[in-house]
């Protein structure tokens, strides 16, 4: 691989900002068009906005759809002179450089409790010679179906493998680690992939838990330098994995009959989703610190949620299986006990 491919931490290639912008903007359009067809009841309302300090974005929101109770797909392209603390804490060498960030983020809250909530985010950042890619997607079911979790992970592993077979080995446990509610002692859902600060240097894990599973796997694998082009292709492959990873699950579950019990549990679990986004999510913190558009930053929150003091799922119930198994990191492909635990609760198709 020649130096022209920009392996490692060299400067970004020409037109890097334009290409990153076009990638995430294209993902927003492609995904929204497919979701409108899937919903068949509502369209996305588009709001374009400008950021006084520099840049702007485009938010697309669907409300009261046939399939999606609420969904938001946001694109932003922002720039400025002064970096926020959330970035400088991670990359102090970026201090003093004008910065640029672009990305697309999405959260869909389906109406039917048997259809999982999903989140996606892919982004690119530059500040002088400093650049990196970040992103990921994760699935939050309210009722447990083993094959849905396996399908979602399988499609994203295949996307990562197009760039390097080592990537998913780190990005899967990193996702489990990132989408973790420390105050609840549980993950937000069944995970997926998550990566950040991928600057080509070869260190795959750049999170905050140096003793966690993702960090351990990253150390065992050693450095795997990547070019800007390879990391661009990773974002492209993973972004395009969204529809084949999620649409078949929606199509399979959206017509399943449900009652008030399922709806109430869905709303209760949505409360956990809101807790994570408001307390732990770095994207929310970055947006608020940089005077982003509040409506777009908080559009990931569910339209309805509820809290119940001291709630415990009934013993040996589907709700208990969700809480005990599907909010804990799992080896979805190699753990033979998962089927044994799921089958008595109709969680195996």
UniProtKB/Swiss-Prot annotation:
Cell compartments where the protein resides: Cytoplasm
Gene: hemF
Keyword annotations of the record: Chlorophyll biosynthesis, Cytoplasm, Heme biosynthesis, Metal-binding, Oxidoreductase, Porphyrin biosynthesis
Family assignment from sequence similarity: Belongs to the aerobic coproporphyrinogen-III oxidase family.
Active site: 119
Residues binding substrate: 105, 121-123
Organism annotation: Prochlorococcus marinus (strain MIT 9313)
Cofactor(s) the protein requires to work: a divalent metal cation
Region of interest (Disordered), residue spans: 1-21, 37-60
Group of enzyme by EC: oxidoreductase
Subunit architecture: Homodimer.
Function: Involved in the heme and chlorophyll biosynthesis. Catalyzes the aerobic oxidative decarboxylation of propionate groups of rings A and B of coproporphyrinogen-III to yield the vinyl groups in protoporphyrinogen-IX.
The organism's place on the tree of life at top rank: Bacteria
Protein name: Oxygen-dependent coproporphyrinogen-III oxidase
Binding of a divalent metal cation, residues: 109, 119, 153, 183
GO biological process, one term: protoporphyrinogen IX biosynthetic process
Gene Ontology CC: one annotated term: cytoplasm
Family matches, as InterPro entries: Coprogen_oxidase_aer, Coprogen_oxidase_aer_sf, Coprogen_oxidase_CS
Positions of the record's site feature: Important for dimerization: 183
Region annotated Important for dimerization, chain positions: 273-308
Pathway named in the protein's UniProt entry: Porphyrin-containing compound metabolism; protoporphyrin-IX biosynthesis; protoporphyrinogen-IX from coproporphyrinogen-III (O2 route): step 1/1
Pfam families per UniProt: Coprogen_oxidas
EC number: 1.3.3.3
A single MF term (Gene Ontology): coproporphyrinogen oxidase activity
HAMAP family in the cross-refs: Coprogen_oxidas
């Amino acid at each position: 691989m020649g130096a022209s491919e920009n392996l490692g931490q060299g400067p970004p290639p020409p037109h890097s900002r334009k290409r990153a912008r076009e990638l995430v903007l294209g993902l927003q359009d492609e995904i929204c068009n497919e979701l409108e067809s899937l919903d068949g009841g509502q369209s996305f309302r588009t709001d374009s906005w400008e950021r006084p300090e520099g840049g702007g974005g485009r938010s697309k929101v669907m409300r009261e759809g046939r399939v999606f109770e609420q969904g938001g797909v946001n694109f932003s392209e922002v720039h400025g002179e002064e970096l926020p603390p959330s970035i400088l804490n991670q990359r102090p060498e970026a201090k003093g450089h004008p910065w640029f960030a672009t990305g697309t983020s999405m959260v869909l809250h389906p109406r039917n409790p048997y259809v999982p909530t999903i989140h996606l985010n892919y982004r690119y950042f530059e500040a002088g010679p400093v650049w990196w890619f970040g992103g990921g997607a994760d699935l939050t079911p309210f009722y447990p179906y083993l094959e849905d979790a396996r399908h979602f992970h399988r499609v994203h592993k295949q996307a990562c493998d197009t760039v390097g077979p080592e990537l998913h080995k780190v990005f899967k446990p990193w996702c489990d680690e990132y989408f973790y509610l420390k105050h609840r002692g549980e993950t937000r859902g069944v995970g997926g992939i998550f990566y950040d600060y991928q600057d080509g240097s070869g260190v795959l894990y750049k999170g905050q838990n140096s003793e966690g599973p993702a960090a351990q796997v990253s150390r065992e694998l050693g450095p795997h330098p990547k070019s800007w082009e390879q990391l661009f292709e990773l974002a492209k492959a993973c972004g395009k994995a969204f529809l084949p990873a999620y649409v078949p699950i929606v199509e399979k579950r959206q017509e399943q009959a449900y009652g008030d019990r399922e709806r109430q549990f869905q709303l209760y679990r949505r409360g956990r989703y809101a807790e994570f986004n408001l307390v732990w999510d770095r994207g929310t913190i970055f947006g608020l610190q940089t005077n982003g558009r509040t409506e777009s930053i908080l559009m990931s929150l569910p339209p309805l949620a509820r809290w119940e003091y001291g709630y415990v799922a009934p013993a040996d119930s589907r709700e208990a299986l969700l809480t005990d198994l599907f909010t804990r990191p799992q080896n979805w492909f190699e753990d033979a006990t998962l089927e044994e635990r799921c089958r008595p609760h109709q969680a195996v198709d």
